[in-house]
Amino acid sequence: MDQDIKTIIQYPTGATEFDIPFDYLSRKFVRVSLVSDDNRRLLRNITEYRYVSKTRVKILVDTTGFDRVEIRRFTSASERVVDFSDGSVLRANDLNVSQLQSSHIAEEARDSALLAMPEDDAGNLDARNRKIVRLAPGEVGTDAVNKDQLDTTLGEAGGILSEIKQTQQDIGDYIEEFANGTTYLKNIVMVYNQGSANGGETAIVLDRTDEVFAVPVIYINGDRQEVGFQFSYDNTTKTITLVKPLQRGDFVVMLTSEGTHSLASILAGPDGASRIGASGGLTVQQAIDRILESHIILPQWFGARGDWSDTTNTGTDDTAAFEAAIEMAVTLNYTEVYVPAGSYLITRELNLNGGNRNTRLGARIRGAGWASSVLVFKAPAPETPCISIIGTPGSHTSKGVEKLLIKSHPSTTGQGIGILCRNTCFAHVTEFLIANMNIGICLENYMTAGSFTEFCYFTNGRLFTNNINIQFNKVQNGDNSFHGSNFKNIQNQVKKNGGIGVQIVGNPQGAAYLYNMTWDMQFFGGAGCIAMDLNYCNTDYVGGKLTGESDLTFKADGNSRFDFHGRFDSIGKVIWDTATEGARTGGTYVFANRTSLENAVMTNADAGRLPAGVSARPLPADWADRNNNGVYPATFHIRGPNIESMGFVTYDSPGNGFFFGQLPFQGNIKDFNPRFWFNSGGTSFNTAATAYTMKLVNGEGLYFSDTTIRALSDGNVSLGEWNRRFKEARFTSWDIGTSIVPTSTATKDIGTNSNRIRDIYLANSPNVTSDSRKKSFIKPIDEALLDAWETIPFSQWKLNDSVAEKGSEARWHVGYIAQKVEESLQAFGLNAGDYGLITIGDDGFMLRMEECLVVEAAMIRRKLGLTYK
């Protein structure tokens, strides 16, 4: 077989495996057949043949009755390998594949045409050593004759050569069917004048209802003719103008698409995109229109290359293309700029407002993912941002950044700002990575009061070894208010040896005031890593969860405080580098579980009220990550059937306990002053006061001091009850147990002249000391005393207290009246005060009745004349 035929090959049967000598786009475009002179069988893939490799097939059926195996490429014009379903991106590879498919179709058309018995270089029809079957009889002298006609002619001497004319008609019909058939790519192959030129033509008008955009190639008797050389084409009139006129009988095939030149011709026109099909019955132009309607702009439309190489450190400057894309997005009513995968060199600020505008609305910029869409920023100055979101305070913006990696150019490492949010509200930045810049993210209140940044959201991002990963910056007289800006799932990789994770910068004109924020952030540190740096900063209601690893330093000047409603937990070393802590603070830094004062020794620790060397820190409510240490100290819930109680626990070791105390107004936590404390063993209760009152709701209670324990009111409090008694009591003057015993002899009294005991009930008479060794000046009773005693009358009476209590029921008492005793003694020249018979106090007179009765007995004895023996 003549191997000028590129897409059809036949092998003799006998083998089972056969090579595919041509390239193809899809296996469905390759046809394998068994053929003979009068029969053909198209085989099915997998069941009747299979692919051994990409370039070899194996026959699986019996080849009896066939002498050849034919492998033919038959590329479909309707089943496009590339359908441009995603009209948002026209890739060079897709265009090449589409061109290749068109080229294959054209090549197959050429082979089909050549197989249709083309002319050779001498102008003769060439059957290529094959039989011509179904040949009509010739009609004129120059017609071919078939075998029957030849036999008839030879046998009958009559010519039926006129039937050969039908052969020409059949060939023309076949070629025309080939050109117009639905199984071939329309507007690709056309045959002129049914396959035979009239002769002398210098122009061919294409009689087609569909538009013919370009005719880059024609074949005249198989000889390739190039547009611009052997002919020209006017697509407005559909006219081909030939350099040389045609000869009679020339076979002319016109190809309307071949190679890159043809496809470029189609796409070059203003309506080129409307000529390319896409999925769903759309054209590429329709797909582009829908993209524009959905507000997505590509920098590639404006020449972006995305060809930066980290290996060679070279690439096209795509800044202008990005600026143009942003400008178009703004023009199309604040739409989105989509950044396909690639690395793009940027050398100027990309303002999402477009140009140098400062407006509320602007474009969003979105990449294919931070691992795919990369902006390499060659910063012209340390403070120049790669992307800026600049707006008007107090109103929400449409601007945002998503799925991008922003990193520094190798020549400007540590320079520039990744993303600047200035005087803007509600900007969203998500799925990002910013690396090796001067500042990763800067939130800036710029220049004037009322210029503030608020409610910006940063999620699912990593800030990697920028000089400052996150900065809040109050510039000059910019508003001090930063509020509502939240960070969620942020990895803050701090640059070693001086890098800062979060920096908050105010100024003497006003502190940067952060409030109503939620932070979920993980700090990664190391040698010289500063987690936070405060300069003129204050906060309210900033909360969330912060964690750390490796060494992290927290710095602050003397004008700053950072209160965080959430924990900061770290498995690394934490260093507090703060100015002198203020007198009114729990620490410059305060978290739910720790404070920058956590290593400061408490003032009262050395006063004996607290254990030596202790410091204060907040008590977390949860037990997590404390299980290995017994979860102390802690408060906890005690539960059971009908039990809902509180528990308090501390470490059971000397020096531990529960401390309750006070701070002066606006005092420092390290100046905590314990007032009451219990030891952990429950063996002591202590107070720092010199006097203490235990008071009941009705006002009764006890008063304790260093000298006294007494009731709070007079006569209402009992010590013990009839069935709840004290066993013993020890006092300075008395010991009370089984006896009431004074602590020293003859020095204690029971009652006083003004506070008397009403009744004493005794089982035996009182014992009175009468030991001569305890007495001095012993002598007989004075006669004058006995004389006076004879004049003292006996009386009976009722006590006033009893009358007041019992009235007429008060009982009578008998005895002496003390005043009468005094008067009688005075009448006989005696001083009653010289005798222990009478006690005179502020509240009245009292008599020692046992001594009075002794005088009475001595007086009677004298009257009876009884004398001592």
Curated annotation (Swiss-Prot):
The keyword Protease is assigned to this record: yes
Protein keywords: Degradation of host capsule during virus entry, Degradation of host cell envelope components during virus entry, Host-virus interaction, Hydrolase, Protease, Viral attachment to host adhesion receptor, Viral attachment to host cell, Viral tail protein, Virion, Virus entry into host cell
GO molecular function: peptidase activity
PTM section of the record: Proteolytic cleavage and release of the chaperone in the host cytosol stabilizes the folded protein. The cleavage gives rise to the mature tail spike protein but is not essential for catalytic activity.
Signal peptide: none
Peptidase S74 domain span: 770-869
Cited function: Functions as a receptor binding protein (RBP) and probably mediates the attachment to the host capsular exopolysaccharides. Displays a depolymerase activity that specifically degrades the K3-type polysaccharides of Klebsiella pneumoniae capsule, which allows the phage to reach the host cell membrane and bind the entry receptor.
Annotated InterPro entries: Endosialidase_C_dom_sf, Pectin_lyas_fold, Pectin_lyase_fold/virulence, Phage_T7_tail_fibre-like_N, S74_ICA, Serralysin-like_metalloprot_C
Entry annotated with the keyword Protease: yes
Entry comment, domain topic: The N-terminus anchors the RBP to the virion. The central part and C-terminus probably binds and degrades the host exopolysaccharides. The C-terminus.
Gene3D superfamilies, sorted: Endo-n-acetylneuraminidase, Endosialidase, domain 4, Single-stranded right-handed beta-helix, Pectin lyase-like
Primary localization class, coarse: virion
Protein name per its UniProtKB record: Depolymerase 1, capsule K3-specific
Pfam families reported in the protein's UniProt record: Peptidase_S74 (PF13884), Phage_T7_tail (PF03906)
Assembly information from the UniProt record: Homotrimer. Interacts (via N-terminus) with depolymerase 2 (via N-terminus); this interaction probably gives rise to a branched tailspike.
Name of the gene encoding the protein in the UniProt record: 37
Top-level taxon: Viruses
PROSITE patterns: ICA
One BP annotation, GO: proteolysis
Subcellular location(s) of the protein: Virion
Organism: Klebsiella phage KP32 (Bacteriophage KP32)
Similarity comment text for this entry: In the N-terminal section; belongs to the Teseptimavirus fiber family.
GO cellular component: virus tail
Site (Cleavage): S770, D771
